[in-house]
Amino acid sequence: MTQNLQMADRFDSSAVEQALYKHWEEQGYFKPTENPSLPSYCIAIPPPNVTGSLHMGHAFQQTLMDTLIRFNRMEGNNTLWQTGTDHAGIATQMVVERKIAAEEGKTRHDYGREAFINKIWDWKAYSGGTISQQMRRLGNSIDWDREHFTMDEGLSNAVKEVFVRLHEEGLIYRGKRLVNWDPKLHTAISDLEVENKESKGSLWHFRYPLANGAKTADGKDYLVVATTRPETVLGDTAVAVHPEDERYQSLIGKTVVLPLANREIPIVADEYVDREFGTGVVKITPAHDFNDYEVGKRHGLPMVNVMTMNADIRAEAEIIGTDGKPLTTYEAKIPADYQGLERFAARKKVVADFEALGLLDEIKPHDLKVPYGDRGGVPIEPMLTDQWYVSVKPLAEVATKAVEDGEIQFVPKQYENLYFSWMRDIQDWCISRQLWWGHRIPAWYDEAGNVYVARSEEEVRQKHNLPADLALRQDEDVLDTWFSSGLWTFSTLGWPEQTKELKMFHPTDVLITGFDIIFFWVARMIMFTMHFVKDENGKPQVPFKTVYVTGLIRDEQGQKMSKSKGNVLDPIDMIDGISLEDLLEKRTGNMMQPQLAEKIAKATRKEFENGIAAHGTDALRFTLAALASNGRDINWDMKRLEGYRNFCNKLWNASRFVLTNDKLDLSAGEVEYSLADRWIESKFNRTVGEFREALSQYRFDLAANAIYDFTWNEFCDWYLELTKPVFANGTEAQKRGASQTLVRVLEKLLRLAHPIMPFITEEIWQKVKGFAGIDADTIMLQPFPKVVKSELDESAEMQIGWIKELIIAVRNIRAESNIAPSKGLEFLVRNVSDEQRKILAENDRLLKAMAKLDSVQVLSADENAPLSVAKLVGNVEVLIPMAGFINKEAELARLTKEIEKMRGEITRIENKLGNEAFVAKAPEAVIAKEREKMQEYQNGLEKLQTQYQAIENL
């Protein structure tokens, strides 16, 4: 019985992918079961910001996640890939603010808080839909019914619960401390949102007169203070020197007169001071510098805030004690002509006034890093503001121990050190933001200034017996976005309710993320989860067992992808293709700087002169997996993408060869499996072992390479060719053996490749399954291949390996001697073992067919051969008689190269064996092996020289 079908010449990804995905989703294949007895496997996706669309970094990480999810689903695990999006407070609010400004000329204040928030929800509906559609295009096997958003009602309840409980435990408090303040956006921002930019600045050296007649060691009546920020001088509350700096030791505890403000401030000793920086004397401004803030706390210095929220100079200084409360016992006046000045105008005036007073010592050029808000785009100010904080040290201790004890493992392991360095120096976390979009802080105030924290206003009134007519005002601030995303693994599973999903899927198995958010997100998830989620024995649960840290995807030149560089690649464009015109519009449209737009356009035209061709999702995913070497940044490579699109076509064509082969015989009857059949089954099982081992180590690159190497080099290039002589001249039993092996290995190969290449494997598998006698609906629920030890056949691998070498030797002789591939040749071998002689006899027909040979003859060791071109395969001489078509010059040139190569190997081993250190340290077996190799090479050299002499004498 034969069966075959029609298959298109090429795989058309655009005709297949979206229809297949729709079918998978409609059939519910992505959903976990409710069977609690099955082992579970869960990944919580790092939720993309709802602000825009997916970039290549998302595509990269999500491909790796989906590979693991699909693999585990095929392993029979109850699999959940929990997805969703993040409300991304500041980023989303800014996108919508810009949108209404551009389209309507309005600000959020024109709308008011409630109406503006409704505008953001409208934007979220649009943008979130875009992201989920893109994730579908990537083939992500997600249960979309469980999709969450960090502002969903359930997740909002979890946020309130965590806030209230931490407050009740005394771990959340409100206080006045120094924060990164964005004077344009009027909000505190996290360190992650601060971009330090290299800048050419100045180091001003000011003279601060010593008070009460004090003098320096060299007789001066002033100290020279070096600063990069003259505008904060009015907030100075001390100057500091290093305690071991002999120049100033006699002055410690004395005072200087602060110029312009005319108040005395102390000279303090602190190890923070760098004796080599400037003059070794620095001004201490605790209200306007993070390092000074810490120095101020150590020395009990007042904090004098001289700036408004706009970063202008205040009319009156705000004076705060180290306890964060107003300090009435300290006086610091701001001169009238500074009041209201913009900070950089104040800088100029301070410098001019110091110069006018004769107190400007010198100005030196100075390279420095200026912190900018990455959203507002202006320099941030360290600012004393009232904010809410989490006291994280107790949480951090537990979270640190979890990694130390191996409950959570980082891959690559070196990232554990980064985690530890942050966690062991952790500071209280500022969690409030002065925004409208986000989780509003669940705290209420009455007119007397009392603060009430609860899950709702109703709970506040009940808990504190407050009368209905007592006016309460909810805190205007919202929580840092990282607060809600820190609850992601458990809030998405229904916490604080003890749901069956929480019991079944928590802790999750692996988190795949970038190194840049290990502290901001990963650490906080570990801290929050272990504090709030306990197992049945009351032991803190980790959020995930493994953190796999990926590198960044960079462009082909190794540059970070960014809109301003104009080098961003959209993963959907890799899949569908894009014209040059559309790509130019995408990269330069709406750009504020025309010169930059022209530069980007020029670079784009050069790199993508014909736009980007369609490659399909499978080629994109395979490229991303193949590039995923552990922890390293990845330079995107369009040539690799093209290569893997060709690989998809190679797999398609191999399947087409099998399934449209009219000689394919899957009928019942006697079956005889050939050496080649046994070899390909054995090689397949080794590939399965390599893939499984690679995936267990998160070496997606090695897993992809194992599939590629087997498919292209073993199955397509060799096994398919090895079956052709069988179908041409084999017995019926041999044809059945080859037919069954072809179909069986192809079907298993599709299952092996499915986690990385879901679409093409499903499309082909639907055609293969009937041939393979499989009655099932989808490849994704088929078992993933396991290593079958009984199918491992070292003898078959050795024999076919040797036959391949003989065939390659003949092909190389043809190429080097310019002999047509179709020309029949005589084939002589000399110096073969009895076992090799047997292999040749059993595979005579195969060798003749594959190497296009007219005859195969074994010569005895002392038997002379006619004039031939020779190749060595190990010790065996492969000889092709050259009568009638030898090119004497070409053959002598080829032999010269072979002789030089052999001499090089002999010299290498001679040097090794002549190295006394090597001979002294190397085991006897290693030395014996080297001597054996030397003898082999010397014998080979002798044969090549004999051959050379014979041809030269023609």
UniProtKB/Swiss-Prot annotation:
**Gene Ontology biological-process annotations:** valyl-tRNA aminoacylation
Any one Gene Ontology MF annotation carried by this entry is:
ATP binding
Q: Where, per UniProt, does this protein localize?
A: Cytoplasm
* Classification via SUPFAM superfamilies: Anticodon-binding domain of a subclass of class I aminoacyl-tRNA synthetases, Nucleotidylyl transferase, tRNA-binding arm, ValRS/IleRS/LeuRS editing domain
The motif 'KMSKS' region: which residues? 560-564
- Which keywords does this Swiss-Prot/TrEMBL entry list? Aminoacyl-tRNA synthetase, ATP-binding, Coiled coil, Cytoplasm, Ligase, Nucleotide-binding, Protein biosynthesis
Recorded hits in InterPro entries, A to Z, give:
aa-tRNA-synth_I_CS, aa-tRNA-synth_Ia, Anticodon_Ia_Val, M/V/L/I-tRNA-synth_anticd-bd, Rossmann-like_a/b/a_fold, tRNA-bd_arm, tRNAsynth_Ia_anticodon-bd, Val-tRNA_synth_C_sf
Please report a single Pfam family linked to this protein. tRNA-synt_1
Keyword Aminoacyl-tRNA synthetase listed? The answer is yes
> One GO term of the cellular component aspect?
cytosol
Per the record, the major location class is cytoplasm
Q: Where is this motif: 'HIGH' region?
A: 48-58
Q: Might you give the EC number(s) for this enzyme?
A: 6.1.1.9
Name the family the entry cites: Belongs to the class-I aminoacyl-tRNA synthetase family. ValS type 1 subfamily.
What the entry says about domains is: ValRS has two distinct active sites: one for aminoacylation and one for editing. The misactivated threonine is translocated from the active site to the editing site. The C-terminal coiled-coil domain is crucial for aminoacylation activity.
Q: Quaternary structure?
A: Monomer.
Protein name in UniProt: Valine--tRNA ligase
| Organism of origin | Actinobacillus pleuropneumoniae serotype 7 (strain AP76)
